[in-house]
Structure formats: structure tokens, C-alpha cells
């Protein structure tokens, strides 16, 4: 029950090609191979070989993706966790990469997101909803909105 368009392309070759483009979790790689109609046994064998040669490593892939999102300063910790969970990484593994003192970073990121989206303080509720949709906690949201309003007031005074 192989793919009809290229019968000699094995699950291992397909998985290797997928991993060459981007690291995937084991769960996501299994899904992608299943969608391509490879038999379960062939998928299991391919995954086993990829793990053996360390081409497939959930911890490495999760850490790399976490760092990329964390360093970009565009995502809340909750949003990073949700994206990684959706990508097939286990919650325990995701939590392993969370720094313990991320609140200061969260406030800084929320403030920068507000500055990028809003050029002047508009409706406070709209700003709060925007940050809430990004996954920020209420205390971070209120603090960032207050800081944004003060920053905008100071900019207006200087003009």
C-alpha cells in the first residue's frame, strides 16, 4: 500500500527528506508519513533508524524551536508552549526549556508588541484583547498597557 506516484521511495527516504528541511517531533513525522500512505510497520522502522542515528531527536528539535521563538521576542511563553505542543512535543519536554524568571521578558515582549501595533494609546480594551490573544497573563497585560500609555504620554510631552 505504497504511494502510487513513486513506489521505490521508502518511508525512511521520505522522512529523511522531511528532516533535512526542518526538525520535526516524532509525532509530527509519523503524521506526515501516515498522510503519505506509508504502512505503519515501515513508518515504525524508519523512525527507529532515524532515532538510532540521532537524526530524529525530540529534545534537540524542541529546544531549537523553543529558542528560536523565545529569542524572536514576538511570542508569549503560553503561545510558545501552545505552538510546540501543536507540533507534537510533550508538555514535560516543553517545560524543560522554560526559564524560571521569564516574567520580566514577558512584560518587555508585550510592551514591544503594543508599540509595534499601536502608534498611540487607543482603546485600552482593544490593547488588552490583543495581548490576551497572544497568550499573555492578565498581570503582564495591565503592566504593559500602563507602561505603553506612560511612554506615549512622555513622547507627546517631548514634542
Q: What function would you assign to each model-found segment?
A:
Residues 1-159:
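An alpha-helical, amphipathic repeat domain used for nucleic-acid recognition
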Amino acid at each position: 500500500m505504497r504511494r502510487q506516484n513513486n513506489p521505490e521511495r521508502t518511508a525512511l527516504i521520505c522522512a529523511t527528506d522531511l528532516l533535512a528541511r526542518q526538525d520535526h517531533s516524532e509525532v509530527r513525522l509519523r503524521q506526515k508519513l501516515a498522510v503519505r500512505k506509508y504502512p505503519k510497520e515501515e513508518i515504525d522502522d524508519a523512525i527507529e533508524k532515524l532515532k538510532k542515528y540521532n537524526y530524529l531527536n525530540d529534545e534537540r528539535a524542541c529546544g531549537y524551536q523553543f529558542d528560536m521563538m523565545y529569542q524572536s521576542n514576538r511570542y508569549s511563553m503560553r503561545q510558545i508552549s501552545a505552538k510546540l505542543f501543536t507540533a507534537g512535543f510533550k508538555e514535560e519536554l516543553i517545560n524543560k526549556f522554560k526559564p524560571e524568571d521569564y516574567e520580566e521578558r514577558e512584560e518587555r515582549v508585550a510592551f514591544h508588541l503594543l508599540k509595534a501595533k499601536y502608534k498611540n494609546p487607543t482603546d485600552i480594551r482593544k490593547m488588552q484583547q490583543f495581548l490576551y490573544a497572544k497568550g499573555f497573563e492578565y498581570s503582564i497585560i495591565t503592566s504593559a498597557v500602563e507602561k505603553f500609555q506612560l511612554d506615549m504620554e512622555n513622547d507627546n510631552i517631548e514634542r
